């Protein structure tokens, strides 16, 4: 899967808006993930006790993790598909330590698309959504290949 330069520009244009409020976007994305797919919460020992959206919004740990997730994803997106160096340690930790299934990466991708559309409707129309979907699919495909190299079938 290859994105055109124009598609990468659409992705990076909306990502600049994410970077203007990484903590807020990260928090919204994780809350959306956990509400839409409660089973994903079980992978996070430090968040398992958060049962309501209000508890999630009040959690500084959740907000910090959102920043970590989006900072890593931003570094990958900015490489425009040439993300081997950034992807390798991420795949290693997610496959061997955290045991995060690829399906959960699909779930967070859905949450990212939803939050970006709801927060930036003017900058995240059909073309930008399509480009971001392709970029996230490329990320998932490449991380799945790394998982396989590591012997994790996630």
Swiss-Prot record:
Q: Which GO terms describe its biological process?
A: removal of superoxide radicals
- GO CC annotation terms, alphabetical: extracellular exosome; sarcoplasm
Primary place of residence? cytoplasm
Question: Which InterPro entries does the record associate with it?
Answer: Globin, Globin-like_sf, Myoglobin
**Phosphothreonine carried by residues:** 68
Q: Which PROSITE patterns has this protein been placed in?
A: GLOBIN
Subcellular locations according to the entry: Cytoplasm, Sarcoplasm
Alphabetized UniProt keyword annotations: Cytoplasm, Heme, Iron, Metal-binding, Muscle protein, Oxidoreductase, Oxygen transport, Phosphoprotein, Transport
Q: What reaction is this protein's catalytic activity?
A: Fe(III)-heme b-[protein] + nitric oxide + H2O = Fe(II)-heme b-[protein] + nitrite + 2 H(+); H2O2 + AH2 = A + 2 H2O
Q: Which residues bind heme b?
A: 94
Q: Which residues bind nitrite?
A: 65
- How does this polypeptide assemble, per the annotation? Monomeric.
Q: What does this protein do?
A: Monomeric heme protein which primary function is to store oxygen and facilitate its diffusion within muscle tissues. Reversibly binds oxygen through a pentacoordinated heme iron and enables its timely and efficient release as needed during periods of heightened demand. Depending on the oxidative conditions of tissues and cells, and in addition to its ability to bind oxygen, it also has a nitrite reductase activity whereby it regulates the production of bioactive nitric oxide.
- Designated name of the protein: Myoglobin
Which organism is this protein's natural source? Physeter macrocephalus
């Amino acid at each position: 899967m290859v994105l055109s330069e124009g598609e990468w520009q659409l992705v990076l244009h909306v990502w600049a808006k994410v970077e203007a409020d990484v903590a807020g976007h990260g928090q919204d994305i994780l809350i959306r993930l956990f509400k839409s797919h409660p089973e994903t919460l079980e992978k996070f020992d430090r968040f398992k006790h958060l049962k309501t959206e209000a508890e999630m919004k009040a959690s500084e740990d959740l907000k910090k993790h959102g920043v970590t997730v989006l900072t890593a994803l931003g570094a990958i997106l900015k490489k425009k598909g040439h993300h081997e160096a950034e992807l390798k340690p991420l795949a290693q930790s997610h496959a061997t330590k955290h045991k995060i299934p690829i399906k959960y990466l699909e779930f967070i991708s859905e949450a990212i698309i939803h939050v970006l559309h709801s927060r930036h409707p003017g900058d995240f129309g059909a073309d930008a959504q399509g480009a971001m979907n392709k970029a996230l699919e490329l990320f998932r495909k490449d991380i799945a290949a790394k998982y396989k190299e590591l012997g994790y079938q996630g």
